[in-house]
Amino acid sequence: MGCDCHFFTERWTNQKNYEGPKDIQINRDIKLNSILENGEHQEYSWITADTWTNDDGYWSADEYYDDRNYFLFAILANVRNGYRIEPLAEPRGIPEDSCYPIKYIVNEWKGDGHSHSYFTLKELLEVDWDKYCVKLPEVDRTNWLDDFKQTLKELKEIDKNPENVRCVFFFDN
C-alpha cells in the first residue's frame, strides 16, 4: 500500500479573504474579539494560501507539492524512513492556530491521516538540501529532491517574508 503526503500552505496576514471551507462562527468570534480589544478588526492570523475547489460539497486543495517521494517523507517527518535518514524533526502535530481549511481537511481524513507536522518556509529554506542529495551505490538520489526544491521557490511568491508562510502536512497509507 502506498503512502501520500497531503501538503498545505498558509500565510500569516491580517486579510481574511480566501477561497475554501470556512467556519462562520470562528471568523465571527475572531472579528468580534478583535473589535472589542482594539476598536477595529486588525488581527493577524494564518489563512490558506492554497487554491480550493468544492466538488459536490467536498472541499479539496490544489496543493503546491503532491509527489510521492519516500526519501522526502523521511526527511520531513521520519515517515517511510527505510533510508535511516535523520529527519528535520519528529512530527509536530497540526498547529493550534492553523487555518480552518487545514483543520477541516485533517478532520475529513480522521484516523487515516498520520504524522501531522509543519515547517515555516524560513525553516525549509535554511535546510542544506544538498547534504541529502548523495549518490549511493544502489541508487542515484542526486535529483530526488529537485521537485521539492522547485516547490520551495514557488512558495517564496506567497509572501516576501518566509516566516509568513507555513507548510502544514500529514500522510496517509
Which residues fall in each region the model found?
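Acidic (Asp/Glu-rich) sequence patches and key acidic residues
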Residues: 1-164, 171-173
